Design a protein with these regions (language model features):
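Active-site-proximal beta-alpha core segment in soluble small-molecule metabolic enzymes
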Residues: 1-188
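Active-site anion/phosphate-binding pocket segments in diverse small-molecule metabolic enzymes
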Residues: 7, 20, 39-43, 61-65, ...
Length: 305
């Protein structure tokens, strides 16, 4: 997916988990895709091209500053891999600073403000402390604040004011950073739904497409994927390990929640909730067997349906 996005002009690649971002860097290196030149980046912290994309990651195991400074810490690996990192709290930022000092390098950081998702991000009343910490570290050359970012909670609900309210809180966050002497070169807020249905959020410097990259609509009641020009790009495949004939009235799987109304053929697929299939999918989730459309019957087991 990363290479496909780059071919279409993507200059940033967002990966949630730090360990995934490190793997992506290895993959890009093997494909001959190198990070932005360090000297050029120092001159232009927003620099990113489709040939030398930036990798941004935002979920990292919690570590203290002392742990972050250790040679094998994930944060030091991230800095060696030239990853952009997110900080929502002073504690996380201090860990990034410690890793940067240990690596004798500059960390490129995206500060996150919570504008209404109530997930990661500093509350507006706490953002000033985070900004002051960042400004001091930036003046010492340990970090560069690349961006202020946030995430939309209800962008798929196009007729309510929540997204506009989040945008206003985001702008307040920008002012708090400006008051601390931080001028961020990159601003990003819009998700797939924001990009599609809230142009004010998409008018910033970067949009983060998530569900849209998988070819799905954020809300099919607003617009179906095909109406948006989106096509699903993923599917899960497995071979049937057994096909058997059962009699009418025979219960299938735990609790016999589904019983055959007539004599039936059933097939066994070696995938279950241990592989990510929801347990709630029983008796309704669609399956294609060859070109024949059918559905899961009986409860989803750990390793079989």
């Amino acid at each position: 997916m990363a290479l496909a996005c780059m071919r279409q002009g993507a200059t940033w690649l967002g990966v949630a988990q730090l360990h995934e971002a490190l793997r992506l860097r290895e993959y890009l290196d093997a494909a001959g895709v190198k990070p932005v030149d360090a000297t050029q980046l120092a001159q232009n912290p927003a620099l990113a091209t489709a040939q030398t994309p930036r990798i941004f990651t935002w979920i990292m195991p919690p570590v203290s500053a002392q742990e972050a400074a250790q040679a094998d810490s994930g944060l030091r690996q991230a800095l060696r891999a030239k990853l952009d990192l997110s900080a929502s709290t002073v504690e996380v930022l201090q860990a990034i600073i410690a890793a940067a000092k240990a690596e004798d390098t500059c960390a490129y950081v995206h500060l996150k403000v919570d504008t209404g998702m109530a997930r990661a991000g500093a509350n507006l009343e706490d953002l000033a402390d985070l900004a002051q910490c960042a400004a001091q570290a930036q003046s010492q050359g340990h970090i560069k604040v690349v961006a202020l970012w946030s995430h939309l909670a209800r962008a798929d609900e196009i007729l309510i004011p929540a997204t506009g309210q989040q945008l206003e809180r985001y702008r307040q966050g920008l002012q708090i950073l400006a008051d601390a002497g931080i001028d961020v070169p990159v601003r990003h807020l819009a998700s797939t739904a924001g990009t599609l249905w809230h142009p004010d959020t998409a008018a910033l410097d970067m949009d983060r497409f998530g569900i849209g990259l998988y070819g799905l609509s954020p809300d099919h009641t607003v617009a179906r994927a095909q109406d948006l020009g989106l096509h699903p790009i993923m599917r899960l495949e497995a071979r049937l390990t057994q096909v058997k004939h059962i009699k009418a009235g025979q219960g299938v799987s735990y609790g016999a929640t589904w019983q055959a109304p007539t004599d039936r053929w059933v097939g066994l697929v070696p995938l279950g909730y241990g592989d990510g299939i929801l347990r709630s999918a029983y008796d309704r989730a669609p399956i294609l067997v060859g070109k024949q459309r059918t559905h899961i019957v009986g409860r989803v087991c750990m390793d079989q349906v």
